[in-house]
Amino acid sequence: MAEEHKHEESIMEKISEKIHGHDDSSSSSSDSDDDKNSASLKTKIYRLFGREQPLHKLFGGGKPADIFLWRNKKVSGGVLGAATVSWILFELLEYNLLTLFGHISILALAVLFLWSSASTFIHKSPLHIPEVHIPEDVVLQLASGLRIEINRGFTVLRDIASGRDLKKFLLVIAGLWVLSKVGSSCNFLTLIYIATVLLFTIPVLYEKYEDKVDDFGEKAMREIKKQYVEFDVKVLSKVMSKIPKGAFAFIKKKD
């Protein structure tokens, strides 16, 4: 009887192990299915301009990104305030850059010189003027990044000029036309200041209302693509049909 009882217990243990093993496998498979579904949902979310990284990483992920996205409000406000004061001085008050630099330098050097000279008479320690130098690695990084961006711009311009992508060509022409109109209505300094203000406001507002902006951008892109298809059928296809095919063959051979 004892052996039969042990045999029944071993059978029950095997059955329970199989049941628990099936539950574990089913739960793990369901978890993996949930992970896959959540991952697929994440990939389906539309991001403006096909963005795949957070906005902070797109700005470099360092101190410049913290400044533009107002992670440090004092520094961001100071930079924007300095840009505003500079624009007021040079644009509204029509102050000359060299004149301003000369006056500030004269005032600063005079104060430092008088304080250092008078410190021995008033029995106070002279001012400690720190050494100022530009690190070489920072300059090399900036130069390397600027070189890469300039070369990338040259590559894009070459592709556009070669006649391979008519859509990109029309977009660039429209952008340059808008830029020329804006440049004719305001000078270069005002344009730089407007770009600075936009750089300090649009990214942080976009980060705050990201989902709403992306949803609106998705609808806008659908409408733009729809209008472009109609424009392509009604206008571009007719224009391209009138251009001799030998011209494009000549361009391809030249490339």
Swiss-Prot record:
Organism this protein belongs to: Arabidopsis thaliana
TM region(s), chain numbering: 75-95, 97-117, 186-206
Keywords: Acetylation, Endoplasmic reticulum, Membrane, Transmembrane, Transmembrane helix, Vacuole
Residue ranges, annotated region (Disordered): 1-38
One Gene Ontology term from the biological process aspect of the record: response to bacterium
Protein's name in the database: Reticulon-like protein B3
Basic and acidic residues bias: start-end ranges: 1-25
Pfam families assigned to the protein according to its UniProt record, in alphabetical order: Reticulon
Organism lineage: Eukaryota, Viridiplantae, Streptophyta, Embryophyta, Tracheophyta
InterPro entries assigned to the protein according to its UniProt record, in alphabetical order: Reticulon, Reticulon-like
Membrane topology, from the record: Multi-pass membrane protein
CC per GO annotation: cytoplasmic side of endoplasmic reticulum membrane; endoplasmic reticulum tubular network; vacuolar membrane
Ranges where the Reticulon domain occurs: 64-255
Localization (cell): Endoplasmic reticulum membrane; Vacuole membrane
N-acetylalanine carried by residues: A2
